Amino acid sequence: VCMHRGCFGGCSFCTISAHQGKQITSRSEQSILRQIDKLKDLPEWKGYLSDLGGPSANMYGMHGKDMTLCEKCARPSCLHPAICKNLNQDFVPLLSIYNKVDSLPHIKKSFVGSGIRYDLMSEEYGKELITKHVSGRLKVAPEHTSTEVLKLMRKPAWQVYEKFHRFFEQVNQEAGLRQQLIPYFISSHPGCTNKDMQQLAEQCKRLNYRPEQVQDFTPTPMTLATTMFYTGINPYTMEQVYVARSKEEKDKQKGYFFFWKGTRTSNAAAGGYRLKVKGNRKG
């Protein structure tokens, strides 16, 4: 069930704000509940709702406190480099929908299958989400671990993700659950070097991650990242930005994701990077 459209995250590689808008357009609670009520009439309905979501599932109902300021604002992101003070971060409408959906007699369980912004979360919402609406795996998108690369991506610092990781583990432990975080990562984003990818592999190994939800950067129209990819310049600072463009360079960066496979192919792709991952004595 798509609850809203639009995204104010402003990630430099993403086009959602271009084709859905930066302002969140949310469906009414009544509209959402009417759609869910009709599901019980489907012959294949089993009582499990796979996704109460949107582009970023936890942005439902959010908007500027003073919309006249939003109309004048030229910031590409309401979350980066810091969350805008004018952003209304009210989770009450979203939590209300979760509770009403779960109270419906034909709903056995409702999940959030869409990705969430872990840098936009209250403790109350986080606990509700993790204990009641995760089907075993929760999708999040740190995208990288390098401070400089994350700045170019307009994503929160890696430390913000680590804090959420600890919160996720704590809530699971307290609730007696064994659920997983599924982090999304990107290689070869403008500004990303082999050294940055080595750091990413080391952080993933430290957290016992085996990255699978990964992709190599693909330039898409109307994004800052694509501008940097083709020009090699950050247009905001006019500074040079390293760009991995050749197949060899891109394959090498992508190979760092698969340090855990230890295959000859994955090792060769990253130039024997497994030997460089800290704590890996087997080489």
Question: Where would I find each of the regions flagged by the language model?
Answer:
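Short beta-alpha connecting loops at secondary-structure transitions
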Residues: 17-21, 82-83, 149-150, 184-186, ...
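Amphipathic alpha-helical segments in well-structured domains
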Residues: 29-33, 94, 161, 197
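Canonical Radical SAM [4Fe-4S] cluster-binding loop centered on the CxxxCxxC motif
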Residues: 1-30
